[in-house]
């Protein structure tokens, strides 16, 4: 599963995770993977994938170019993928 889709799914699941233990554990795994990221990477993924900001908006927040944020975003996704190991079980 694409990491950006996982993070968007995280935002949706978090709102709906009332009584489903599997979803709760899935959310915990995602949160752990996010917590293992560098603060800047976590900030960028949270803003773009979970909160819905555009790369341009996040670039403006950080005072960097859109080109730079694109690199940071893809680097953050790569690190997230390494931290988050969902095997579909």
Cite the ranges covered by each PLM segment.
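N-terminal interaction/assembly modules
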Residues: 1-27, 31-32
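Short helix-coil-helix linker/hinge
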Residues: 34-41
């Amino acid at each position: 599963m694409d990491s950006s889709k996982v993070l968007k799914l995280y935002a949706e699941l978090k709102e709906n995770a009332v009584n489903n233990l599997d979803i709760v554990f899935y959310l915990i795994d995602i949160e752990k993977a996010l917590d293992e990221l560098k603060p800047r990477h976590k900030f960028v993924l949270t803003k773009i994938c979970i909160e819905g900001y555009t790369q341009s908006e996040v670039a403006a927040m950080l005072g960097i170019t859109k080109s730079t944020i694109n690199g940071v975003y893809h680097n953050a996704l790569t690190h997230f993928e390494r931290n988050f190991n969902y095997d579909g079980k």
